[in-house]
């Protein structure tokens, strides 16, 4: 007998920051848990999350998520005052925090959020050590992408 498949999507991705690859040179990838309130979890399950302008701020040996917009649900947040842009603490090990502090203070890196997803029943945030691109870097990347598309087109017609 075949099992019935659920009608829910199997993707664990909640939100993506597609602009990050265009705006920054992404280096090392990290994963962190996010400390959330109950109404935020319900809103995330409903898909009311935006992380396009999101970055991580390190303060007093802790990491905080800034700029993530989690819009409250009307039904889930009737008795609580909800701030969609509040600081959300990231759950990282001490070794990871020390490495991030060193990279951001000494080497001039930024910490940019690239994805938010479910891992089992926990919300995880994927972020990268990143350096900002200048305008000429973006133009070079555009030329490289155009050239690779043109090469593929030529190889397709040649075959």
Swiss-Prot record:
Keywords: Cytoplasm, RNA-binding. GO terms for biological process: trans-translation. It comes from the Bacteria. Required for rescue of stalled ribosomes mediated by trans-translation. Binds to transfer-messenger RNA (tmRNA), required for stable association of tmRNA with ribosomes. tmRNA and SmpB together mimic tRNA shape, replacing the anticodon stem-loop with SmpB. tmRNA is encoded by the ssrA gene; the 2 termini fold to resemble tRNA(Ala) and it encodes a 'tag peptide', a short internal open reading frame. During trans-translation Ala-aminoacylated tmRNA acts like a tRNA, entering the A-site of stalled ribosomes, displacing the stalled mRNA. It is found in: Cytoplasm. Residues 138-159 are annotated as: Disordered. This is SsrA-binding protein. Gene3D superfamilies: 2.40.280.10. Residues 138-153 have a biased composition (Basic and acidic residues). PROSITE patterns: SSRP (PS01317). One of its GO terms (cellular component) is cytosol. Its main location: cytoplasm. The keyword Cytoplasm applies. One of its GO terms (molecular function) is RNA binding. Belongs to the SmpB family.
């Amino acid at each position: 007998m075949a099992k019935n498949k659920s009608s829910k999507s199997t993707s664990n991705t909640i939100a993506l920051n597609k602009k990050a690859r265009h705006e920054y040179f992404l280096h090392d990838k990290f994963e962190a848990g996010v400390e959330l309130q109950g109404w935020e979890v319900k809103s995330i399950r409903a898909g009311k999350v935006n992380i396009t302008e999101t970055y991580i701020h390190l303060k007093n040996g802790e990491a905080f998520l800034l700029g993530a917009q989690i819009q409250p649900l009307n039904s889930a947040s009737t008795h609580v005052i909800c701030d969609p842009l509040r600081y959300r603490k990231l759950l990282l090990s001490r070794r990871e925090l020390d490495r991030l502090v060193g990279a951001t203070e000494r080497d001039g890196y930024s910490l940019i959020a690239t994805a938010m997803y479910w891992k089992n029943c926990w919300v995880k945030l994927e972020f990268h050590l990143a350096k900002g691109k200048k305008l000429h870097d973006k133009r070079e990347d555009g030329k490289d992408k155009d050239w690779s598309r043109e090469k593929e087109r030529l190889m397709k017609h040649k075959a």
